[in-house]
Protein backbone atom coordinates (compact mmCIF):
# COMPACT_ATOMS: atom_id res chain seq x y z
CA UNK A 1 0.00 0.00 0.00
CA UNK A 2 2.84 2.37 0.91
CA UNK A 3 4.62 1.60 -2.38
CA UNK A 4 1.44 2.30 -4.33
CA UNK A 5 0.88 5.58 -2.51
CA UNK A 6 4.52 6.57 -3.10
CA UNK A 7 4.14 5.90 -6.84
CA UNK A 8 0.98 8.02 -6.99
CA UNK A 9 2.76 10.90 -5.24
CA UNK A 10 5.67 10.57 -7.67
CA UNK A 11 3.34 10.73 -10.67
CA UNK A 12 1.56 13.81 -9.29
CA UNK A 13 4.87 15.57 -8.59
CA UNK A 14 6.10 14.70 -12.08
CA UNK A 15 2.98 16.18 -13.66
CA UNK A 16 3.35 19.37 -11.60
CA UNK A 17 7.04 19.64 -12.51
CA UNK A 18 6.40 19.15 -16.23
CA UNK A 19 3.55 21.67 -16.18
CA UNK A 20 5.74 24.24 -14.43
CA UNK A 21 8.54 23.79 -16.97
CA UNK A 22 6.40 23.77 -20.10
CA UNK A 23 4.93 27.26 -20.22
CA UNK A 24 4.19 28.10 -23.82
CA UNK A 25 5.42 31.26 -25.45
CA UNK A 26 2.37 33.33 -26.55
CA UNK A 27 1.62 33.75 -30.24
CA UNK A 28 3.12 37.02 -31.47
CA UNK A 29 3.48 38.77 -34.84
CA UNK A 30 7.01 39.05 -36.21
CA UNK A 31 7.69 42.62 -35.04
CA UNK A 32 6.81 41.66 -31.47
CA UNK A 33 8.89 38.47 -31.61
CA UNK A 34 11.84 40.60 -32.70
CA UNK A 35 11.23 42.95 -29.76
CA UNK A 36 11.32 40.13 -27.19
CA UNK A 37 14.80 39.04 -28.42
CA UNK A 38 17.12 37.39 -25.84
CA UNK A 39 19.59 39.98 -24.59
CA UNK A 40 20.82 37.97 -21.61
CA UNK A 41 21.86 34.87 -23.51
CA UNK A 42 23.16 36.92 -26.44
CA UNK A 43 25.32 38.96 -24.05
CA UNK A 44 26.88 35.88 -22.47
CA UNK A 45 27.41 34.09 -25.78
CA UNK A 46 31.11 33.25 -26.02
CA UNK A 47 31.85 34.42 -22.46
CA UNK A 48 33.60 31.84 -20.27
CA UNK A 49 31.78 31.53 -16.93
CA UNK A 50 33.21 28.13 -15.97
CA UNK A 51 35.35 29.57 -13.16
CA UNK A 52 34.31 31.51 -10.06
CA UNK A 53 35.48 35.09 -9.77
CA UNK A 54 35.24 38.39 -11.64
CA UNK A 55 35.00 38.46 -15.40
CA UNK A 56 37.46 40.45 -17.48
CA UNK A 57 36.44 44.01 -18.37
CA UNK A 58 36.16 43.09 -22.05
CA UNK A 59 33.59 40.38 -21.22
CA UNK A 60 31.66 42.72 -18.94
CA UNK A 61 31.51 45.32 -21.71
CA UNK A 62 30.13 42.71 -24.10
CA UNK A 63 27.40 41.78 -21.62
CA UNK A 64 26.68 45.40 -20.66
CA UNK A 65 26.23 46.39 -24.31
CA UNK A 66 22.77 44.78 -24.22
CA UNK A 67 21.63 46.90 -21.25
CA UNK A 68 20.26 50.44 -21.57
CA UNK A 69 20.12 49.96 -25.33
CA UNK A 70 17.09 51.70 -26.89
CA UNK A 71 15.02 49.65 -29.33
CA UNK A 72 13.48 50.95 -32.55
CA UNK A 73 9.92 49.63 -32.48
CA UNK A 74 8.06 50.60 -35.65
CA UNK A 75 10.01 53.84 -35.87
CA UNK A 76 9.63 54.72 -32.18
CA UNK A 77 12.50 54.50 -29.68
CA UNK A 78 11.41 52.36 -26.73
CA UNK A 79 12.97 50.52 -23.77
CA UNK A 80 14.35 47.16 -24.89
CA UNK A 81 12.82 43.96 -23.50
CA UNK A 82 15.57 43.32 -20.93
CA UNK A 83 15.47 46.89 -19.59
CA UNK A 84 11.73 46.61 -18.83
CA UNK A 85 12.74 44.99 -15.51
CA UNK A 86 14.49 48.14 -14.27
CA UNK A 87 12.20 50.94 -13.09
CA UNK A 88 13.81 52.15 -9.88
CA UNK A 89 12.67 49.40 -7.49
CA UNK A 90 14.19 46.25 -6.01
CA UNK A 91 12.56 42.83 -6.26
CA UNK A 92 13.49 39.62 -4.43
CA UNK A 93 12.20 37.53 -7.33
CA UNK A 94 10.52 38.32 -10.67
CA UNK A 95 7.16 37.41 -9.11
CA UNK A 96 7.64 40.44 -6.84
CA UNK A 97 7.97 43.05 -9.58
CA UNK A 98 5.48 45.91 -9.55
CA UNK A 99 3.48 44.92 -12.63
CA UNK A 100 2.28 48.46 -13.30
CA UNK A 101 5.79 49.92 -13.53
CA UNK A 102 7.05 46.92 -15.48
CA UNK A 103 4.22 47.09 -18.04
CA UNK A 104 4.60 50.86 -18.44
CA UNK A 105 8.09 50.27 -19.88
CA UNK A 106 6.72 48.36 -22.89
CA UNK A 107 5.86 49.48 -26.43
CA UNK A 108 2.35 50.83 -26.09
CA UNK A 109 -0.55 52.69 -27.60
CA UNK A 110 -1.52 55.96 -25.88
CA UNK A 111 -5.21 56.51 -25.21
CA UNK A 112 -6.62 59.87 -26.25
CA UNK A 113 -8.51 61.55 -23.35
CA UNK A 114 -11.16 62.86 -25.75
CA UNK A 115 -11.48 60.24 -28.49
CA UNK A 116 -11.17 57.31 -26.07
CA UNK A 117 -13.19 58.85 -23.23
CA UNK A 118 -15.90 56.18 -23.17
CA UNK A 119 -13.29 53.40 -23.08
CA UNK A 120 -11.36 55.17 -20.33
CA UNK A 121 -14.56 55.55 -18.30
CA UNK A 122 -15.21 51.80 -18.60
CA UNK A 123 -11.66 50.98 -17.54
CA UNK A 124 -11.96 53.26 -14.51
CA UNK A 125 -15.07 51.38 -13.43
CA UNK A 126 -12.94 48.23 -13.10
CA UNK A 127 -10.31 49.97 -10.98
CA UNK A 128 -10.97 53.63 -10.12
CA UNK A 129 -7.53 54.18 -8.56
CA UNK A 130 -5.42 52.54 -11.27
CA UNK A 131 -5.76 55.27 -13.87
CA UNK A 132 -5.48 58.33 -11.65
CA UNK A 133 -3.02 60.89 -12.98
CA UNK A 134 0.07 61.27 -10.82
CA UNK A 135 1.10 64.38 -12.74
CA UNK A 136 -0.40 66.74 -15.30
CA UNK A 137 -0.86 65.29 -18.79
CA UNK A 138 0.21 61.79 -17.70
CA UNK A 139 -0.75 59.27 -20.38
CA UNK A 140 -2.81 56.10 -20.16
CA UNK A 141 -1.01 53.27 -21.97
CA UNK A 142 -2.40 50.16 -23.62
CA UNK A 143 0.04 47.22 -23.67
CA UNK A 144 -0.38 43.77 -25.23
CA UNK A 145 -0.53 41.14 -22.45
CA UNK A 146 0.96 38.52 -24.77
CA UNK A 147 4.03 40.71 -25.25
CA UNK A 148 4.38 41.18 -21.49
CA UNK A 149 4.07 37.43 -20.91
CA UNK A 150 6.57 36.63 -23.66
CA UNK A 151 9.21 38.89 -22.09
CA UNK A 152 8.59 37.47 -18.61
CA UNK A 153 8.88 33.92 -19.93
CA UNK A 154 12.05 34.73 -21.84
CA UNK A 155 13.88 36.37 -18.94
CA UNK A 156 12.23 34.99 -15.79
CA UNK A 157 10.34 31.80 -16.79
CA UNK A 158 7.06 33.18 -15.42
CA UNK A 159 3.99 34.93 -16.85
CA UNK A 160 2.24 38.07 -15.64
CA UNK A 161 -0.37 35.84 -13.98
CA UNK A 162 2.39 34.76 -11.56
CA UNK A 163 3.15 38.33 -10.48
CA UNK A 164 1.73 39.15 -7.05
CA UNK A 165 1.66 42.97 -7.17
CA UNK A 166 -1.01 43.87 -9.74
CA UNK A 167 -2.10 47.13 -8.13
CA UNK A 168 -2.82 50.04 -10.47
CA UNK A 169 -3.17 47.75 -13.48
CA UNK A 170 -6.39 47.25 -15.42
CA UNK A 171 -6.69 44.11 -17.53
CA UNK A 172 -9.16 44.01 -20.41
CA UNK A 173 -10.21 40.53 -21.47
CA UNK A 174 -11.83 41.97 -24.60
CA UNK A 175 -8.50 42.84 -26.21
CA UNK A 176 -6.13 40.90 -23.90
CA UNK A 177 -4.39 44.13 -22.92
CA UNK A 178 -3.10 45.85 -19.81
CA UNK A 179 -3.91 49.51 -19.20
CA UNK A 180 -1.63 51.56 -16.95
CA UNK A 181 -0.50 55.11 -16.33
CA UNK A 182 2.92 55.93 -17.75
CA UNK A 183 5.87 55.88 -15.34
CA UNK A 184 6.90 59.16 -13.74
CA UNK A 185 10.61 58.39 -14.01
CA UNK A 186 12.95 56.41 -16.20
CA UNK A 187 15.60 54.06 -14.84
CA UNK A 188 18.39 51.98 -16.37
CA UNK A 189 20.99 49.45 -15.26
CA UNK A 190 24.48 49.65 -16.76
CA UNK A 191 26.67 46.80 -15.43
CA UNK A 192 30.37 47.50 -14.84
CA UNK A 193 31.22 44.37 -12.81
CA UNK A 194 30.27 40.71 -13.26
CA UNK A 195 30.94 38.15 -10.51
CA UNK A 196 30.54 34.42 -11.09
CA UNK A 197 30.04 31.76 -8.45
CA UNK A 198 28.62 28.24 -8.45
CA UNK A 199 25.11 29.39 -7.52
CA UNK A 200 24.56 32.60 -9.46
CA UNK A 201 25.97 35.40 -11.56
CA UNK A 202 25.95 38.93 -10.14
CA UNK A 203 26.01 42.05 -12.30
CA UNK A 204 26.75 45.35 -10.54
CA UNK A 205 26.53 48.92 -11.78
CA UNK A 206 28.74 51.80 -10.64
CA UNK A 207 26.51 52.60 -7.65
CA UNK A 208 26.38 48.96 -6.45
CA UNK A 209 22.93 47.99 -7.68
CA UNK A 210 22.90 44.20 -8.12
CA UNK A 211 21.19 42.02 -10.71
CA UNK A 212 21.42 38.31 -9.87
CA UNK A 213 21.06 35.69 -12.60
CA UNK A 214 20.74 31.92 -12.50
CA UNK A 215 21.23 29.28 -15.17
CA UNK A 216 18.60 26.65 -15.95
CA UNK A 217 18.99 24.23 -18.82
CA UNK A 218 21.86 26.27 -20.20
CA UNK A 219 19.83 29.49 -20.27
CA UNK A 220 20.11 32.61 -18.12
CA UNK A 221 17.16 33.89 -16.09
CA UNK A 222 16.70 36.83 -13.75
CA UNK A 223 16.73 35.82 -10.08
CA UNK A 224 16.51 39.18 -8.27
CA UNK A 225 17.40 42.85 -8.44
CA UNK A 226 18.65 45.00 -5.56
CA UNK A 227 18.61 48.74 -6.20
CA UNK A 228 21.49 50.55 -4.52
CA UNK A 229 20.59 52.87 -1.60
CA UNK A 230 22.72 55.44 -3.42
CA UNK A 231 20.29 55.49 -6.36
CA UNK A 232 18.17 58.20 -4.73
CA UNK A 233 21.17 60.50 -4.64
CA UNK A 234 22.24 60.09 -8.24
Language model features with spans:
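C-terminal motif of bacterial Sec signal peptides marking the signal peptidase cleavage site
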Residues: 17-20
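Short, linear, compositionally biased motifs with a strong N-terminal bias
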Residues: 12-15
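Secreted/luminal cysteine- and crosslink-motif detector
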Residues: 22, 195, 232-234
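Bacterial N-terminal signal peptides that target proteins for export
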Residues: 1-9
Amino acid sequence: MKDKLFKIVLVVLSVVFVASCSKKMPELPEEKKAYVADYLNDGFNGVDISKDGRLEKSDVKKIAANFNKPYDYNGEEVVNSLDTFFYGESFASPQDITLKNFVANFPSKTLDPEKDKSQIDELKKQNPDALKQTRENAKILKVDKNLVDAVLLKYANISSDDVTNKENVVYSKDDNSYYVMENDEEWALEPVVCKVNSKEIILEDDIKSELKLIQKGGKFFIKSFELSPNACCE
